Structures are given as structure tokens and as C-alpha cells.
């Protein structure tokens, strides 16, 4: 019976019957709504209409049905926030009485009503939140027990298309969540899946279809006999099969409408809405209007162009709802109210409509002249206060600023002029681009409560409606419908999270292309975007995002204008007048795909913006040349937008050298003055007057100081002037103020003394400016040298990009008709490019023809090359190792993977907050304080002088008799004031930090640690989390042979002959595994020469084959003694004559292709090595499978000790790698790391670092590869291995020269010592100022303590010397040696078990369970046989421990056996 009929008749029933009927209907509907997967489940957390009509809102069955209590095991909880999220989510479900989650026990106790909710549904709800949930042992779910064999069946499916462990995880994760699936085991090596299922809930065909929908090829291999169900089972099946029960949204809408009319609190409003075009409009209206206060329910029908809204009239009015819908972007919705609704009805909410906020633009500005934090804040304050500016961020370290602004309100030129008016030099660093944030309706953000908030914040989610024709070159217009009924294709962009490798990309593309209405799919791995062209009459963009979500990824439709458009600048020759300009501009703007064209006759340049999907740079050049002009690409310096600091380095170097040349004699004279004379009456030679009032010393001081003041100090004056222009006082202002007043005062009193013909030359302060300028200029010079290093990392990254590409024109059967060398800037999407062996892939693309191996270490960090075949994705900047290939360009310019990595590094360097020197932060308060004290001293002594002249006369040094009393008072007060200003000069404060940093970095370099400046040295002691890369960091990064096994029952050759044959065969291979095997064989044989190989063939992804001869001579020259291995098989004699061996070396597939059978014991032995993180390959000689080689990347011997030491220091340690989870777990167990992030991209590493930083932690990243460089730049301290890539070294803050991981510990230890010394220096400087300033001000004159001017200079010099001597004490630092670390770890350092290591995939924080021996695993491996037939004859220099050592230090470079070749 239709529940709506029951509900519609409520009003005609007696009160008691009506109440019972409503309860019955509510129980039925809400029990169906509680099923997982219903789109309206989350919106029904309360009873809504039932409460409002006076009925009981809860389920009546809750009180009558008995409640059950069960325990659910939950994996993946990390904090109490997880606990609260689970409790809030589950407690809101219907049928849940209560839930208590325990973080310590990793479980939840749930009390629920079985008739409404079962345990499996609860587990699924928890898993949907990102956790792993399962019923505790001994607890039965509310459906038939899984443990009953009679209710389970097993099916084996053949699954093709899996390439890595990520594919296995995706299949297992998706299928395991299906109702009726008990367990699943997917084998990558066997390309099959074994699934135990409940046949009354799901069938094998359904399982096969689900796997096919994920983008794989699946077929049923075999299945168990179908179950025969009795009458009881049939009844149970009917009651359990929840899939047959559905509730349509229309039923729910009608249901609420009926209830709404019955109650006095809710009303139902039918509306007519015009302007809706697609499902995105429906989601836009429902998602925003449904969250307004007073709106209980809303249902929008795209087909009928109507909406049914259930609302509270006391909170909201129909006119308010009409205004709210019409205010939603894009603003073209037209709402008609039903007849009878008063249009002038008062509104309870604001109906003022605000215009949609325009798209923001971001500009990056280069700002010269920023010297400290006090310069940064005024710029940010000034910009943020300007109308139209939404956000600003200034980087002191880079000298750049990012501004997000609305171009409709303020222009970029106005912003640049405003900053220049503050005294800085500004230039535009990069082109502006449009930003339109996508509104995420699933987020927990608060909903706007006013119409202005809605209009300003809600963003349109409709797909791009532009036509997307096939690229046909210039001048071709997009296809338009020829009839009114025709519809052009549309394009949408989907943001995808969770992709970890090229296999994920292939799966998404393959799966989407299976669905009707999808015309083409293009997925970018690094940027996490998918470009989909589709038929809007068949499918809509939200449905496309849902299809991707069904594959196990997070997906959301992006805004149309988030897609970057092409931008090119051309040099055009041949223009003579404005008519030429008009012809070019009009021709370009008429061309389909060109959105903007501007030609300047004076500069002969053209600026063109275009849609790269329709037209390309070469097409634009061709258009211009066709109308009679010549066009070429304007040369752009790729590093022009980076601040290289060359100008600043040059000017501060000049300032320092000038100050030093004239400052050294001044310092020498100061030392001379401090030397006491032999007799008190004797006058020093330099004190003799040349003329009355002018001594030799003062004349020399004047000459030297004048040069320093106006040459060496010129740039200080410039910086101080700019600082004062924007009303801030920094260290430059204080330095200039002190030196200028000291110089001016000294000059004035010297001139006065000469004019008065004084008998004695006065004491001057000419020695102050040279000393200050020398030290400060040196610090500024070194500072800018360090800053210049930041741009070198980006330059190194850009050097990885190819400069030219070979674009080919293809004929029939892919026959190359023409080849052309094209600059990278002119490569277009869709171009076919040829790449020869050893060349770089110039762009991201797909292989059209050819097979090869590609070195993609710049992305994955792994040295193992990856097989590329037709259809495979290649990455710009990677190396083509073997054969020539043709590829189709899919991402060019700024969309390539390499460009994305460059962008990541740029953003990391821009966003990193530099740690300012304590003196700089202090100077903002210190400068005005000292000026006030100095002024106050002047005023006070003038007053004291006029009140009691005797005080001044007593302490003023030998005033001339010709000077009046007033002049004496003024001179004395001014001298005291100058003494305060000079003695308080920030020389000691300024030297406190840089001297300690200079000594600390020098000591670090002597100990094998290169620290780039003071910021990382200061920051290192605050580090709370260290993230290690794997390959090349924790491990050596080079594969090594760990074990060599011979089969005793088939081997007929002695071990050394097998080694000679295998080594000779592999000598012709370029694969890293082949190089490792050859090196091992040479070491074991003790020779550098091998035999000869012919007919060599290497098959990418499989192995090699060849014929080997002339190995007897090698064995004869070898010092090794032959040891036959075969049981009962005599060794081959050395004098038997030359032999030729047919050799096969490779993986399982290679052996199968060559007709060799792999027995189960050999396969199990290979699997055992692979589970330990090693790569196992097989050896066949003369058609007989005779051996197996295990190869791995060994862990560095000090890695485990370094990890233990860091942990003992209270530092958290994590492993983050692009390698697979199996390998990552194997490494983590060996070195003692509990938390692992595997299969991550460079962007994932940056995001993980940012995530930890957002939690308030200081993070250090240790890596060695190009893929690590963005994370190294983002981390608070980036630490690079000295043997790593140049890019990583340039991006890092610290470089470990000796490639020793214990130096990570040493750098933190030295940082603590250095910071401690800096603090001591600052304390000494502050004590000096706190004591010296009162003395200089004359506070202690009444008790006889007087500071003469020369004493002030001497005290200032003494304070500087004391700070320098304090810093030099760091020279005594000694790095803790290895023996000390080993003694501390003795007996405490133990490897972890697999269950102690939590592995997370990509950016997914859900923990992947460690492998445990479950009952299912035991059943799966019950057929394993003994490996007694395998014996190890590896002759190792490590003696008997070789086998154990191989297991202990083994590591798999890649577990994708099918992609490894020798």
C-alpha cells in the first residue's frame, strides 16, 4: 500500500486511530530512510513533520523492540576528535540507542534496535567516515551469520589491468563494502580475485560488473555450486534483501506536504523556477535554500521546473524564499509565486540582493627594500585597507608579495603605485590569474544567514557550457547544432583526490569512457584534475563526479573559469602604421578560440590569450604570417621572475668593503687611544694640535669617518629614508640616526673648538660610524648572498625541462611524413612528438607507438625505470631510456607535471614564514624608546643646569673661559644626550645573533653539515616531527643482490660458472637490476672481465635473453675454487672446451612466454622474498630453470640508530615515500618507524607537511630527489642528502655533506647549542644597555659615576667584543660520536613487527592494516609445500651471516613484478 494514502487520510480519522496510523507509516518510511546510501539519509536526522503535528517523533518500535549491545573494532582513530565524530555520526542514525567509543581500546560499544538497524550497517557507516570497522569476535550481526558455510559461496574472478598494489587496494576496498561480500583476496601476481559472498544477497555476475565498472577487465573463472534454500531461508532472504525496498524523493516530498498542511507550524510552498539547465542548478538551489533558517525540506524538479519547500512561516516568508533563490549565482533563476500569495507580504529576513562578488585575481609583486619584519607589516596593513583587496601576503625572505584583489574595484597599477609611494621599488613578478573558489556543499562550513552572505559566498556549480570541438587548427569554428533539437557537447573539470600513480589515471579514464554520453576523458595526475567532454542530453557533470567517486576517489566538479587559458607574447615585424595593428587584431579576435589580442606598434609586440583546446601558439603565428607579417615568439628569461639579489649583493658588498677600508684604521686608532702613556703628564703624539682646537687624531678621524659616512653608509640612508616614508622605525633608522648625530655633533664641536682657538681639541664620536657600518654591512651582504640561493632550486628544476620537441606529422598507419624541431613554448595539445632513446619527454602525454622504459625518479623518487607501451602516460622531464616512441601531447606549458612541481616549490618558498632575528623584532620598540630617553636626557640636564649650574660645572670637562654659562649648559646637555644615543646604539644587539650564526654554521660545516644561514640554524631546535624519504635517504638508493639460490635437483653447473654466465648476460643490460647483478658476479668471481654475449634481447617489463660463451677463460684466471652444487651431478671440467649457453633472466611472465613451468615451491619462494620487500628474478640456462636471484635496496647501517636517537629526543618520525606500501612497511619495520605514508606524489608530501604545520608542529623533511624538493622547501627545515640531486640540495636549508643520517641528529643538537649562545649574547647586550644607558644619562652622577664621551665609545666597543668572544666559544663544540649514540641505544633498539607499523596510502589518512595471519589467509596458503629443494649457495664476503643479513637489510624498489626487467 502506498504510504502516502495512509498519511493523506489522517485528517478524516478519529484522533486515536490517526495517531496509530501515522506512527505505522512513519516507522515504515523512516526505517527505509535509515538504509545506508540513501541520498536523503543525512537530512532526516530528526523527525521533522512528525514532531510538528504533535506525534511522537521517535520510532515507536524502539520502546517495544528489545535493544542489542555489540562491540565494533575501529582502526584509524588518532585523537579524541575522531571519537567525537564517530559518536556524533552514529548516534544521529535511526535505531541507535547510544554509542560509546574508546580511543585506547580502538573499539565502540553500540546499543541499537535490531529491527531498525543492524551491526553491518553501523560498520558501513563508520567506514564511510574513513575508518576501518568490523564486528568484534563472537558478535553476530543482525543478518545471517557469515560463519555459516551453508550460507556462503566462493567465486574466483580473472582480473586484468592491475598494475600495482594501489589497484589491489582499490578493488578490495570497493568490493568489500558491497552488501553480501564476506571477504575478498586479490592477487596482483596471479591477476585474479577470490571472493567469498552470500548468494542470497549478491551474485558473481554482480561482482564481476562492479570490478568492470572500476576500469578493469573481469571474467568469472569458476564458482561453487549454488545454494539450495529452504522455505525458512527464502523468508529470511525476502526480509533481509533491503535492496528491493526503495522510497522515491517524490514520495517523500508528498509525504511532507501532507504533514505540513496538517500542522500549525509548517507550511508547504510550491514554486515555479525558470532558468534551471542541469542537475547542477538543482543541487545549487537545494543545497543552499535547504540550509536557510526555517526551511525544513526542499525538493526541486528539473523536469517540471518546480520546487516544493516546507518551511516555518514564523521564521521565513514566501517572498524571502523567492528572493533567496533569485539571488543565487549565476543570477538567472526566475521564481514565480503561486496565486494567492501576497507579493507585498512582509519579509522576516533580509531581501536585499547583493551582486555576486567578482572573480579575484592574484598578482605576485617583487618588492625591493624590505629589510626586516617591521617593514613587512605596514605594507600588508596598507594593502589590506585598500578597497578591493581581499588578501595579502608579504615574504621577507624572498622580497615578494602576493595580493588577491578584485580587478573591478582596484587595478594592479594602483596597488603597485601605492607600495612604491611607501618608498619601495615594485615590479610585477608574474601574470595575474583568476581565482574562483569552489563551494563545497559537503563541508562543515557555516551557512550564510543573510541574502548578502548567500549572494557573496555561494558559487555556481554548473558545468562549462562552451562547445568543445575537435582541434582542427586555426580558423575553424566549433560545431553548432544544425537543428533546434541538436545539442553541442560540453566540457567540465573535476577535481580528484586520492590518485597515487599512473594506474589510477588509467582506471579513471578507462572506466569513464565506458559510460554513455562521455566523449573524451583527460586526467592529470599531479594537478589532480580531469577534463571530461560529454553530451549534456545523456549525462551531467555531477553524475560524472559521482562515477569517479564510485571508483574510490574523492571528486567534485570545478568552476569553469578555474581552467587556465593560454597566454603568448609575440614579436611581429613588418608593421608600418596603425592600420597594420588593426588588421592583425581584428583577424586574431575573429578566430575561434582567441579570447584577447593586443598589438603595440611601438614595441612590435603582440599579447594574445587563447583557449588551448581550440587553438595553439603555432596556429596564431601562422594566422599572422598568412596576412603578410612575420611573427616569432618573444624570448622570455625563465628565471626573470625570480629575485636573484644580484643588485643587493653588489651594493652591500661595496658598502662593506668601503667601510672596512676606512674602518680598520679607525679601529687601530681606538686601540692606540686605550694604551696608557708612560707618564701622566706626557701627551700622545696624536693629541698634538695642528691648529688651535684641531688635533692630529681628530683630523684623521674626520677624514676617515667622512668617507665611511657618505660612501659606505649611503645604502643605509636609502633604506632608512624608505622606512621613514611609510612611518616605521627599524634597525636602519637607528643606525643612521646614531651615526648621523654622532658625526654631526663631532663636526660641530670640532668647528667650534677651531673657531674659539681652544687649547685642547674636544673629544669626538668620529669612531662610532665606521665601527657600526663595518659590522652591519657585513651582515647585510651575507644575508643577501644566502637569499640568492633560494632561486637556484627553481633554476635547477627548470633545467630539467627540454628546450625543444620533435613534432611529427603522421600519415596512414602512423607513417612519419615530416619532422620539425619546435621550441617548447610552441608545442600544442594534440601534437604528436617523437622522443629518441636518451632524450627527455618534453611534455606530458600518452604513448601512441613504441615500447620503452622511462626514468621517472623526478616524480616517484624511485630509480627503477617504468615500462611504457602504447596507451601509457609519460611525464615531462622524465628520461626515455630505451626505444624511440611517438606520443601525443596532453598537457603542455604550465599544465605539465614538471611545471606543477616548480609551482609547488615557488608556493612553498613564498608561504614559508621567515624567522626574524630577535634584534629586528626588538628594534621596533627599542628605537623610539632610545630616542625618547635621549631627548629626555637633553631636557632634564638643561633644566638642571639652569637650576644649579654648579652641577654642570663640576662634571663638564674643562670648559673654556670664553664660553657663556648658557652655552656650557647646552653643550653639556647635548653631549650627555649624544652619549646616551651612542652607547645605546644596537651594535651589540645587532651582533648578538649574526656572530653566533656565523660561528655555528662554520662549526656545522666542519662536522659535515652545511647550514644555509641563520634561519634554519635557529629553527632546527624547535623541530617536533622529522619526515624521511625512503630511496636514497633511508636506503642507499642502489639495488644490490641479497641472495643467489640454485635449485639442487636440476642444477648441473657449479656456482661460479653460473655466476660467470649470469654476469656476462647481464653485462649488456642497462637496467639497474642488471647492473646490480653484474657487479655482484664480478665481486664474487674477483674479476673485472667477463665472457661474450650474442643475440642479446631485452623486453621491457619482462627480462632478457642471449647466448653466452667464452666464460671458461674467466674461470681459469679466477682465484676461486669450483664447488659443484648439484647432488650427484659432477662439475663441468674447465678443460672441456668453450661452451655456448642459452640464457633467460627475468620475471615469471618471461619464463612462461619461453615455455618454462614455474613450480609452486619456486613461486612461493619468490613470494616470500617479495613480501620482505625484495625483487625476485629467475634464471634459466639451456632451457632449464636453475636459479633465483633476490635483489633489494639496502638500508643504510646508521638509519635505525638515527631514528632511535631522534625518538629518544622526543621527536616524532615518519616515513613518506612514493614507493608501494609493502616496501615501505618492510623498511619501516627495519629502522623502527611506526607511521608510514606510501604511494605519495610530490604534492602529497607538501600537503602532509602543511597539515602538520597547521597543527602547530615544526616539521623537518629529509630527502634527496627532485620529487622531494617541494616538501623540502615547504618544511620549516629542509634537509637534503649530499649525494642527492642538485634540485633537492638547492631547495633544502641543510645539506648533509657526509651522507650520514646521524648528522640530522647533530644538526638539531648544534642548533640547540647555537640558540643557547644567541640568548646568552642577547642577555649580555641587554645588560650592557640597561647599565650603560642610565650611566650615560647621568643618573649616577651624584654618587660620582660619570661616563665621559670617550668612555661611551670604549664601552660600545667593549660590548661588541664581549658578544663576539661569547660567540667564538661555539668553536669548542664537538659533535657526539657514534660510540656515544650506540652506548645510549645499547639493548634498547629493536626492530618493529609489521603490526606495529601503520601505513597510509597517498593523502588518505585511513590506516591500512598490517598483514596478519587470518583464517582466510591460512586457507589460501594451505597448499604451500616445503622449500627444502631450494638451497642457498651464495658465496658472500660476509660469511655465514650473509643470508640473515640479506633478510635484515632488504628492500624492494618496486613490487610490480611485471614491470621489472633486467
UniProtKB/Swiss-Prot annotation:
Residues 475-487 have a biased composition (Polar residues). One of its GO terms (molecular function) is ATP binding. Cu(+) 1 binds at residues 79, 82. Cu(+) 5 binds at residues 501, 504. Detected in liver and kidney. Belongs to the cation transport ATPase (P-type) (TC 3.A.3) family. Type IB subfamily. Each HMA domain can bind a copper ion, they are tightly packed and closely interact with each other. Wild-type ATP7B can usually be loaded with an average 5.5 copper atoms per molecule. This is Copper-transporting ATPase 2. It comes from Mus musculus (Mouse). The lineage of its organism: Eukaryota, Metazoa, Chordata, Craniata, Vertebrata.
